[in-house]
């Protein structure tokens, strides 16, 4: 009788630990889904900076500012890459 009770309690404990670990894994995977948004924001900032710096460098060289072409649905306007 004691062995059966110990076996049942052990199985219950393992089940609880397994369920908790599965929930934590699911939460961490859900958090990772949001990460590309942050990466996209960083890319947007890089495009904005890249375009304005490119024009400033060309102006200093006594040349007309040829705006750097922005790719992927972006357009260079007023020394900044803007979403088209």
From Swiss-Prot:
Disulfide-linked positions: 51-65, 55-76, 70-81
Keyword presence, Translocase: no
Entry keyword annotation includes Mitochondrion: no
SUPFAM superfamilies associated with the record: omega toxin-like (SSF57059)
Listed GO MF terms: toxin activity
Segment forming the signal sequence: 1-22
Subcellular location: Secreted
Cited function: Postsynaptic neurotoxin.
Family statement drawn from the similarity comment of this UniProt entry: Belongs to the neurotoxin 12 (Hwtx-2) family. 02 (Hwtx-2) subfamily.
Protein name: U4-theraphotoxin-Hhn1a
Organism this protein belongs to: Cyriopagopus hainanus
């Amino acid at each position: 009788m004691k062995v059966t009770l110990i076996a049942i309690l052990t199985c219950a404990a393992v089940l609880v630990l397994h369920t908790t670990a599965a929930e934590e894994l699911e939460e961490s995977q859900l958090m990772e889904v949001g990460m590309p948004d942050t990466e996209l924001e960083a890319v947007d900032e890089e495009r904005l900076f890249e375009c304005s710096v490119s024009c400033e460098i060309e102006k200093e060289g006594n040349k007309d500012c040829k705006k750097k072409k922005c790719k992927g649905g972006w357009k260079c306007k007023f020394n900044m890459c803007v979403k088209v």
